[in-house]
Swiss-Prot record:
Binding site for Cu cation: 176, 180
Record's catalysed reaction(s): ATP + protein L-histidine = ADP + protein N-phospho-L-histidine
Family recorded in the similarity comment: Belongs to the ethylene receptor family.
Cofactor: binding comment: Binds 1 copper ion per dimer.
GO molecular function, one term: ethylene binding
PANTHER family: ETHYLENE RECEPTOR 3 (PTHR24423:SF624), TWO-COMPONENT SENSOR HISTIDINE KINASE (PTHR24423)
Coiled-coil segments on the chain, per record: 416-452
Organism whose genome encodes this protein: Oryza sativa subsp. japonica (Rice)
Gene: ETR3
Name listed for the protein in its UniProt record: Ethylene receptor 3
InterPro entries: CheY-like_superfamily, GAF, GAF-like_dom_sf, HATPase_C_sf, His_kinase_dom, HisK_dim/P_dom, HisK_dim/P_sf, Sig_transdc_resp-reg_receiver
Keyword Nucleus (UniProt): no
Gene disruption phenotype: Enhanced ethylene sensitivity and early flowering.
Residues in Histidine kinase domain copies: 457-691
């Protein structure tokens, strides 16, 4: 039908339909060029403007209405083939078609002749003018479109593979613009050249149009692939968008976790940590309530809650509850059911609340942070319950936030517990330190009291005893009767024992392991027994006891041992026997004992501890017994343990036995049926001393004293002591007894300066190390500065033999231990003079 109506007269009317068909094709398969085609379509001229009107009525530019309807229906795409779209289009075109049919185009201006008819808006002149203006505007628009396409191509270099299509489009648009420009000159009389140019332009336009259409047919598969690629890229973009959303959520969750961790770790108090956790979780997650349940004695107790409503719940849930067991047995977040007791107790049953979540929090112990092998300790778990508002669902990132926060809270609680225990330990250490300081102050006070006691003992007992010993030693040098000498020797030995006891008390200290030091030297055993018997007889006579002594003739005389300690033990045995019984008769028996007897009593073989500078040893047995007058039968031997009646006896006997054991001996007692000591036995082993070496080892009390040697006689001695009591007088008498010329420096403020200058005139300077107002070591050091050659010789007097180390550093030549006895003084002076 379209071909049957295709006449030269209607060519101009049907050309717009062909253009519409081409435009629809491009717009359907090239949607990205729709803006350009839309603009191109708007600028298309109507069929009446492409050529001058034709006067032939049969060659009208409009087709019949039925043919136009069929052509439009065929041209439209399938989705537009509907009567609903076609009817409004025909109604819009019907007025113009009716007006065009009524007008007769009998005026033709091609040659300048013809007349026109009609008037008003629809006159031929007006229509021609409008067509001319429209053609000029269309030409201007067509000429500008290629410039825009070139600018577009310059900005999108990646579209260069389609440059030929763009060039064809540009040529097509330029030719269309040229056609409209030439058409504008055909509304007035014009030469044949204009018609020829117009025909050529239209032919070229048609040719370029068909070439462009053919080129587009080859590009359609590529455009389809681009469409598929666009779909894939769109799907990829959606996936990337989802990943970006997830990343943003993860970043937001990480930020919330960091913020919560920072807030939780601000404090090291357990309660502050828990309340901070509840507040921050509620703020970040928008929760209605939060609660913490702590384990205690087989149940879970509600200890911390964000919102306290004061309800009827008692805040206690059993640890055997199903939800509690499940939550404490899993690592992640668990959503509680609607009938959960734990959720109801945490406020999850109230109106406006959603699904309740819970998670466990491990309560770490302090032992988990200590080194070494970890102990197997059952981990305790607390429960954190989260109550959201109604309609809120738990997302994955929110659960991750809760899990991370629960772990951080567990670590913060463990740190808080560790800090609390550290503070408690610090408080305990501070209390112990205060106790130690108090004990130190008490010890210092006790030491001061002990020193004060020692000072009193030294002033009240030791110094008088030393004076007595010095005087007795002088009396011993006189010509005495045998009975007088016995008494004097006994007094000297007794005073020596008392001095030893006082020294023991004075030198006793808390860190001293050797409370009873031994001084072994050769002595005469017979003389010691005689003196002990003399003192025992005096004690027995004083208490109303009889006394007898039996000494074996084969008993060795010159032995090595500590005669003062042995004398002390014998007197102690006599005192114990006569102090707790009725008056009777005391017997002292001394004999040599076999080694087997001593071995049987000791239960071990004898290991001699003395230096072996003799040929043998001898055991001596001392037996002291008492016989009461009421019964004559002696009791059988009983246990060596003393009775429980006398505490002093037990203490004295234990100390005495310890002293005997130090001398490698043994002592035991035999008690009567009443528990009183009936006899006491002392067994000691002595090293035998040959008479040839007795003089080199110090002699004894019975040694004959020769007259002062020529070196000691006439020796100028300076005696330095700031005390003017009897000790200074006794020391002077002893030196004068030896034939020395004794002088003493004046006391006063210039004592130290006068001593240094005056000491050079003396041969011997004796310094008392126990001076109160002056330091004896400073005096000795000052004297050594004025020494010329070997004179003066400096000798110190001290009660402590250990002071020799300090004296040697101060230039002191020798030390004389107090009490000063005449024979010991003579021996020490002879040794010093011989060595210098």
């Amino acid at each position: 039908m379209l071909l049957s109506t295709w006449t030269p007269g209607c060519f101009q009317g049907n050309k717009i339909l062909l253009r519409s068909l081409i435009t629809w094709y491009y717009l359907e398969f090239m949607p990205k060029l729709r803006p350009f085609y839309f603009l191109f379509y708007l600028t298309l001229p109507s069929c009446a403007t492409d050529s001058p009107p034709i006067s032939d009525k049969s060659s009208s530019i409009f087709l019949p209405l039925a043919q136009q309807q069929q052509l439009v229906h065929w041209m439209m795409p399938p989705r537009f083939r509907c009567q609903d779209y076609l009817l409004p289009l025909l109604l819009a075109l019907s007025p113009a078609a009716a007006a065009a049919r009524e007008v007769e185009y009998h005026h033709c201006h091609c040659d300048g002749g013809g007349g026109g008819g009609g008037g008003g808006l629809w006159s031929m002149d007006s229509i021609f003018r409008w067509q001319k203006v429209s053609d000029l505007l269309i030409a201007a628009a067509y000429f500008s479109i290629p410039l825009e396409i070139l600018y577009f191509v310059a900005g999108l270099r990646h579209l260069l593979p389609f440059r030929w299509v763009l060039v064809q489009f540009g040529a097509f648009i330029v030719l269309c613009g040229l056609t409209h420009l030439l058409t504008a000159f055909t509304y007035e009389p014009h030469p044949f050249m204009v018609v020829l140019l117009l025909t050529t332009a239209k032919f070229l336009t048609a040719l370029v149009s068909f070439l462009t259409a053919i080129t587009l047919l080859t590009l359609i598969p590529q455009l389809l692939r681009v469409k598929v690629r666009e779909s894939l890229l769109w799907l990829k973009a959606r996936e990337l968008d989802r990943e970006v959303v997830l990343m943003k959520r993860q970043e937001e969750a990480s930020w919330h976790v960091r913020m919560l961790t920072h807030e939780i770790r601000k404090s090291l108090d357990r309660h502050t940590v828990l309340y901070t956790t509840l507040i921050e979780l509620s703020r970040v997650l928008g929760l209605t309530n939060c609660a913490v349940w702590m384990p205690a004695a087989g149940e879970m107790c509600l200890t911390h809650e964000l919102r306290r409503d004061g309800g009827g719940e008692d805040g206690v849930v059993g640890v055997d509850d199903a939800d509690v067991v499940e939550v404490r047995g899993s690592d992640g977040v668990k959503l509680l059911g609607p009938d959960s007791v734990l959720a109801a107790a945490s406020g999850g049953k109230e109106e406006g609340t959603g699904a309740v979540a819970a998670i466990r929090m491990p309560m770490l112990k302090v032992s988990d942070f200590k080194g070494g092998t970890p102990e197997v300790i059952q981990t305790s778990y607390a429960v954190l319950v989260l109550v959201p508002p109604a309609g809120k669902s738990w997302g994955r990132h929110e659960m991750e936030i809760v899990e991370v926060v629960a772990g951080q809270v567990a670590v913060a609680l463990s740190h808080a517990t560790l800090l609390e225990e550290s503070r408690a330990m610090r408080d305990r250490l501070a209390e112990q330190n205060r106790e130690l300081l108090q004990a130190r102050r008490d010890a210092l006070m006790a030491n001061e009291a002990r020193q004060a006691f020692q000072g009193v003992m030294s002033q009240g007992m030791r110094r008088p005893i030393h004076s007595i010993l010095g005087l007795v030693s002088m009396v011993q040098e006189e010509a005495l009767a045998p009975e007088q000498r016995l008494v004097v020797d006994t007094m000297a030995r007794t005073a020596t024992v008392v001095s030893t006891l006082v020294n023991d008390v004075m030198e006793m200290s808390a860190d001293s392991r050797e409370r009873f030091p031994l001084e072994t030297r050769p002595f005469h055993l017979h003389a010691m027994i005689r003196d002990a018997a003399c003192v025992a007889r005096c004690l027995c006579d004083f208490r109303g006891f009889g006394f007898a002594v039996h000494v074996e003739n084969a008993l060795p005389d010159l032995v090595v041992g500590d005669e003062r300690r042995i004398f002390h033990v014998l007197l102690h045995m006599v005192g114990n026997l006569i102090g707790r019984t009725e008056p009777g008769h005391v017997t002292l028996r001394v004999r040599a004992a076999d080694d087997d007897v001593l071995d049987d009593r000791l239960g071990q073989r004898w290991d001699p501890w003395w230096p072996s500078y003799s040929t043998g040893y001898s055991s001596v047995k001392f037996v002291i017994g008492v016989k009461r007058q009421q019964n004559g039968d002696a009791g059988s031997p009983l246990s060596r343990r003393p009775s429980g009646k006398g505490i002093d006896l037990r203490l004295s006997f234990s100390m005495c036995r310890k002293l005997v054991q130090m001398m490698q001996g043994n002592i035991w007692a035999i008690l009567d049926p009443q528990g009183l000591p009936e006899s006491m036995t002392l067994v000691l082993r002595f090293q035998l001393q040959s008479p040839l070496t007795s003089s080199s080892l110090g002699g004894s009390f019975e040694q004959k004293h020769s007259s002062p040697s020529c070196q000691i006689a006439g020796l100028k001695v300076l005696l330095i002591d700031d005390d003017d009591d009897i000790n200074l007088v006794v020391a002077r008498k002893l030196l004068e007894k030896l034939g020395c010329v004794v002088s003493s420096p004046p006391s006063g403020s210039g004592f130290l300066s006068s001593v240094g200058s005056s000491a050079a005139a003396f041969q011997l300077v004796m310094v008392n190390l126990e001076m109160k107002r002056v330091k004896a070591l400073d005096v000795a050091t000052r004297i050594s500065q004025y020494r010329s050659g070997r004179w003066p010789i400096v000798m110190a007097m001290a009660s402590d033999q250990k002071a020799w180390e300090k004296c040697a550093q101060s230039g002191i030549n020798g030390i004389l231990k107090k009490p000063v006895i005449l024979q010991e003084l003579k021996d020490e002076l002879a040794r010093i003079l011989q060595s210098t």
